[in-house]
Amino acid sequence: MDMDVMMISMCILASTLMAPGWASTSGFLRVPQSQSIVENEAADFGCEATDPASYLHYEWLHNGREISYDKRVYRIGSHLHIEAVQREEDVGDYVCIATSLASGAREASPPAKLSVIYLESASVQLLGSNRNELLLKCHVEGASGDEPLQIEWYRDSARLASWGNVHLEEHRLLVRQPSPSDDGLYRCTASNAAGRVMSKQGYVYQANIKCLPRLLKKNQKLPESWGKQTFLCRGKRGGSGGLDQALSPAPEDLRIVQGPAGQLLIKEGDSAALSCLYELPAELQNQRIQLRWRKDGKLLRHVELGGAIPIPGHAHDSGKDALLREDARLVLHKQNGTLSFASIIASDAGQYQCQLQLEGHAPLNSSPGLLEVIEQLKFVPQPTSKNLELDAAVAKVHCKAQGTPSPQVQWLREGSLNSSLPDQVEVDINGTLIFRNVRAEHRGNYTCQARSSQGQISATVSINVVVTPKFSVPPVGPIETTEQGTVVMHCQAIGDPKPTIQWDKDLKYLSENNTDRERFSFLENGTLEIRNVQVEDEGSYGCTIGNSAGLKREDVQLVVRSTGDGFAPEETGGDGFLVTRAVLITMTVALAYIVLVVGLMLWCRYRRQARKARLNELSIKEAGGDQPDASVTNGKGSEQEPCLSKQRNGASGKPKSKSNGDAQKSDDTACSQQSRSSKKSVYEQLVLPRSGLSELLQIGRGEFGDVFVGKLKASLVAASAQSDKDADTEKQHSNSENGSGGSGSGSGSTTLSTLNEKRRSKTSMDDIEEIKEEEPEQSALEQLVLVKALNKVKDEQACQEFRRQLDLLRGISHKGVVRLFGLCREKDPHYMVLEYTDWGDLKQFLLATAGKVNTATATSSPPALTTSQVLAVAYQIARGMDAIYRSRCTHRDLATRNCVISSEFVVKVSYPALCKDKYSREYHKHRNTLLPVRWLAPECIQEDEYTTKSDIFAYGVLVWELFNQATKLPHEELTSEQVIQRSQAGTLEWTVAEATPDSLKEILLSCWLANPKERPSFSQLGSALSKAMQSVAEK
């Protein structure tokens, strides 16, 4: 049936192409299609028409207006490309217009609609609440194109479904006859192709019904004063009223003498302290007492006061929001209960309350205090200069300012009387400068002023009125000439500023320097003249005109006939010959197209049958083996992995080329791919069961997903070690059989299905709840691990970075580099499981020893590291990085935050890369990528070139962090943009830390030399550190 439909459509196409006359035979081989694109992603509209008699010129219209091309929106041949789609500018209808250069006939394609998919925020709205029903709505700021938004509801941490008295309908949640079992915090999540967001604030529901008494657990001890007939009243998570009523009040001699009462007004950037003076009786010294600080009802910081074992968790807080992440600005002093802020930011504003919690008793609360922050007056973002198109209907320049109180924004024009704005220029209530019917007199400098009680700030922008370049005399072709003749190609343009004209041949620029000056002449008006034409001059010539308003291009074909052919334009056959030639060409193209389509259909059918046969054979083999492959067990074959490599390693021993056209620059810039003779791919050999993980705790978010700390069964750790040993043995055996110069046959490639990418991969609460906790007696049989989830399965850049980190760590076996235990890929999201230590990352350890992190249980901060200890840490990291270099790999993000340290003072190079929250201050978005610009060498920022020498540069910054105890950032007096500018200009100066030994200063300074070849190697650094440790030990 499909073959018949295809044959009929091809016949119709052939008959259309062979009809005489372009007006009647005009048609589009390819028309632009409507599409929905995620904001900031690229969009492409295809357009291709046919005209047998002449060449065609293409134009594009957006909402009825001709498109002005620039660096973001430009034309590739006849197709339209939009680099980063913006919903405010690019939404609408797009039409392709094809014009015949011979007859001047024009034809327009059907309009194609572009819809932008975006997702900003979600919130829970209460529509109705009474005894009979509870009705909530999930309000979402976003759009999903033709696909509906996916809404999910959660009560506390449990996902809800339509069952029992709970009904879900589109964006609404209805609970009929609510009871105490329905109490809790209700939140919603919305997801589409642009991502997934959760409502920042939910709705807390608590039924006005007393909780039912239940029998106590067996052998549970209670005070004798409570009496024999005692029942336990269990409340729902998220509601504290019922639980507090079931607990006895706190002892009277346990008091909070002074709390954070009143209102505290602090300027942004200043320090602040909230007091909580308490009295702790002697008889309660050994009791479990916890001092807590809450902000807006949410737990912020806590510390143990009594001498008993610290309380690992409390059921009363299990339903609350998660604790704030580690923040060096906040310090809770155990001695007096004071909560101090090193530097106030705007988000610190809120209501604060301190609390004493004695186990078995209701919490003792202080009076609440209000902290208000005076936000500094600033522009968000800074206004920028702009080019406006002449006669544009509307043009806008934004100016937004923030501060306390809210500032007033005003625009002024320099050089005019009273600094007034010209006609048809106005300012709206948001501070946006609006130009209507842009004219030449609107050109000039404009100043945006923001005023408040804090003072005044201003920013000046330059407004330039430009005219898009247009062809006054476009090149016309094709041009046919004889050898040794003369050809003149006209190309003249108008615009403001005056456009420049550039000629190219076959996409290679032409100039007086790369052409024969005796034959090629570039006239002042843009005309190109070629004298004594040669056969090699034949080709496609393009004329590009451009100014600050945009670029335009026209192509012309030059055909050179040899004098031996007896060609003369006036002696060619009449119109009959041209028509016959056009018909023959059309029939040949149509026939070739039909043959190609039929061949592709047969080839695809053969590939499907071959793939099905391979999968069946693999399933049979794996079913009889000791360890079935995860892809076969999953029932979906190896096509389940859209983000991992689609090819298996061959046995040739040759490295594979990198994807996305990113050429391999040197041995230092990419990991060499080691060959394996195993039938399984390298990723299948890393498979770990997801059930082997337990007690996952999220510690942050990285570039491609969430990052957790958890535990892995010791049996799986041993199996992973044995697998690595077997792989090395197999590799040695393969090398002994094939020899160094031998080459084996490569394994077949496996096509991977992308059905999983129809939904957005995200780490959900259900995935974490599937990993059940182990019994306490099994904790000794578990290994602490770091788990990195791949959530962005549709982001090719994130998938490529995930594969790069896998290839980096799987090929290294060294005590100075963390182990890669395996890969959980039974379902999305994939988990990368790495070795972790009991003391965590090195930066937090350095901050703790410097007294910058609240240790909670300790009476005082740990002592600072000695010089010999710092040198030992630097030496271990240098050994680990030397192992990475010998594996022909690069790290690309070496810093103390990406190293881990154990209680045995063993330091290893790792890769947590928590760039989205915990260490977001140490990364900066440059060229649409988050980069640690303060640790990067100049060649990494300018040319995106990563080598071992760039890792040497980062290692020098790491040693600087070690001797400064990681208490400050490199060049913290500069902004990230200033660091980038000075690094590119070569004016960024580096100095070693004051505590650095004299013997190391010279080699550490050489790590930051501008020429990468002059920087030392890791082996040289290790030798220098070893000598420095010996000299320090002798002293």
UniProtKB/Swiss-Prot annotation:
Polar residues compositional bias, start-end: 658-676
Classification via CDD domains: Ig
Membrane-topology descriptor: Single-pass type I membrane protein
Positions bearing Phosphoserine: S681
Disulfide bonds: C47-C96, C138-C188, C276-C354, C399-C448, C491-C543
UniProt-annotated location(s): Cell membrane
Pfam families recorded: I-set (PF07679), Ig_3 (PF13927), PK_Tyr_Ser-Thr (PF07714)
Subunit structure: Interacts with plexA; component of a receptor complex that mediates the repulsive signaling in response to Semaphorin ligands.
Protein name: Tyrosine-protein kinase-like otk
Lineage summary: Eukaryota, Metazoa, Ecdysozoa, Arthropoda, Hexapoda
